[in-house]
Amino acid sequence: MAALSSRSLSRDHFERFRAFGFLVFRGLFTPEETRDLQRQFDRVMESGNRDALGIGRGTDAATAQLRLDLASDSRMQDIAECVLGDEYQFMSVNCTAYAADTPWHAASAVVQWASRVLKIAIYLDPLDVHSGCLRVIPGSHRNSQRLLDPRWSLAPDPLFGIRNRDVVWDNPPWGLAPQEVPYMPLETQPGDVLAFPEDLLHCAFASKGPRRQISVNFLELPRTEEQIFDAKLHNAWGGGRLLRPPQDFVDSDDPSLRRMTHGLVALGFEPVAD
């Protein structure tokens, strides 16, 4: 991969993320870098398969080099630090090819994390409102503000009806079809990057072909007893590997890679080799 330059983030970025639940970085990857990511993505996908929904995923072993490249990229690290603080922990790099519509959903309806989780999505194909770009409801992540201020836990969530992707649309919330729910489209070109928490309500409709996405996922370092218990519970739900840091990160000469895994190791998550 070509050398990647750093791009600083300001307090405004943090406040924007906190208010609306997402950040958009246009052209964060150069055309040359994007072509390299596309080639790596396609190689990874050759190792995987498609599920019943037509979603293609690569294997963990096949993503090892891409994982290393992106986790050590200062731009990914800057975004994670801006949102989660300087002790963010690495979760995963995933390659996914979406071939069908993705219904409205957000993690907080079904799988709640006591620590904040950040998804940084790199899009490799042109996507607009007519071809399956991400649609979001700005501010809908505020259900997760309960993590920052317990008073939020007392507030009702008027959007709960569409947080579960398995909602039965035969009797749609508010009498609206899923495509009619008010939204903001986040149209992207290859090399653009979106950052958002899984608590943000999002979907994609009008898909006209595979939507190639690379996601880099980070976790706020669990500190409280509740957060630590919750992290271990999610790791168990994820087959015991979800939060196990890569061995090559733990042993790396790069201090930034060691730093984004040391917290999980200290909590007893055993490193895993590919």
Question: What are these model-derived regions, one by one?
Answer:
Residues 1-20, 25-114:
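Non-heme Fe(II)-dependent double-stranded beta-helix
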Residues 131-201:
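Double-stranded beta-helix
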Residues 6, 22-24, 119-123, 183-185, ...:
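Conserved hydrophobic/aromatic beta-strand scaffold that supports enzyme active sites
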Residues 98, 137-144, 218-223:
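Short edge-strand/loop segments of extracellular domains
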Residues 102-107, 130-136, 145-149, 206-207, ...:
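A short secondary-structure junction signal
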Residues 112-129, 187-188, 195, 217-221:
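Short, conserved beta-strand element in jelly-roll/cupin
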Residues 47, 193, 199-274:
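Non-heme Fe(II)/2-oxoglutarate
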Residues 107-117, 181-182, 188, 209-210:
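A short beta-loop-beta micro-motif enriched in histidine and acidic residues
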